[in-house]
Amino acid sequence: ATRHVLCDLSSFNPRRIPAATIGWFSPECTHHSSARGKKRQEQFGPDLFGETLPSEAAERSRATMWDVPRFTEAHRYQAVIVENVFEVLQWVMFDAWLLAMTSMGYRYRIVSLNAMHAWAQGPAVGQSRDRVFIVFWKAGNRAPDLDGMLAPPAWCERCGQMVAGEQAWKPGRSAGRYRAQYLYQCRVCHDVVEPVVLPASSFLDLTNTGTLIGERTRPLKPRTMERIRAGI
């Protein structure tokens, strides 16, 4: 069974959670800095819905990253996986956060992967989502085999066959987004290859044609109407 806890995570006692071998964390990512010393909301303005968190709320959002070492200290996991957006690597406190984890005897590797290329455990996702995974393991333990997770199937024109793609980083890069910072290449001839991806139709119900706004029986929310007017 899965236990769900609705709480203020910053004040939650991690020892109330049962011990586990692996800790998986996906800290809130909306308000991480996109450039050192500049807050994301201040740099880019309001979000898609015209909303901007107060600076105190944005700081609390970024502070969820610190719950990772807090829970890890309590449970001493054999391995820890932290999933987040690429911008977390540019967070001004990222190096200090890494130090907190390595001080507890963990080694780590930062992995960049787009969800549309995540074929290792089954079908990938039919949408492009760049993510970073910071994978920790206890020093002395065998490092996890992560390369197998980064080998999506791809067609190599020169070799004339399907191959397992290999990440090829642009000069000076070791983490980042697909195409912007890295590509995939054939392991044999080293030509650039394009991994297999699923179309959006793979997860869309094309028989559901939806409802026209004019045919709705319930009125739209005031905020929705404001956005429609702004768009018109």
Region locations from a protein language model:
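Conserved active-site and SAM-binding loop architecture
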Residues: A1-I232
